[in-house]
């Protein structure tokens, strides 16, 4: 991996190292997950979090089609996801897409906000990047402003 992710975390959030996660949590995604951060919850509860993923595109894949189709990937990957909205996100990332949705995990309603974009480099070609913020739905209003500001500050550096 030649890139690293930088983001100005909101108060109460911190980066999470892979070795802090439960064993097997990233099984099958170890090569794509580039950054994880979470808010430290006040009580034992689902912690609001950010996961940044990088997925290389094949030489025959159309970057524009992959970007638009990546919204379908989250729906297919998580049982019961309902997409609420998807729109261009030029104000956050050139050529980016912003989407949101909801699902239930272990009896907790969750809401996600995902920023997706394509980044091309000479050495590695085109890659799909996604930054997915997730929190309990009942807390989304309280966290949205922080999530939005973190997404604005997020950058991939070589």
Predicted regions and their residues:
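Conserved polar/disulfide-associated segments of primarily extracytoplasmic proteins
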Residues: 3, 18-128
């Amino acid at each position: 991996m030649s890139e690293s992710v930088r983001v100005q975390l909101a108060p109460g959030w911190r980066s999470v190292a892979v070795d802090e996660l439960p064993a097997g949590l990233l099984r099958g995604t170890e090569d794509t997950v580039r950054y994880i951060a979470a808010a430290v919850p006040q009580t034992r509860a689902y912690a609001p979090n950010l996961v940044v993923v990088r997925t290389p595109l094949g030489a025959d894949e159309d970057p524009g089609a992959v970007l638009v189709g990546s919204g379908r990937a989250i729906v297919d990957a998580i049982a019961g996801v309902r997409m609420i909205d998807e729109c261009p996100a030029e104000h956050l990332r050139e050529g980016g897409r912003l989407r949101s949705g909801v699902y239930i995990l272990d009896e907790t309603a969750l809401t996600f906000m995902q920023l997706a974009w394509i980044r091309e480099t000479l050495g590695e070609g085109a890659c799909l990047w996604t930054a997915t913020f997730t929190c309990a739905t009942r807390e989304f209003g309280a966290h949205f402003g922080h999530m939005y500001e973190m997404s604005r500050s997020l950058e991939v550096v070589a």
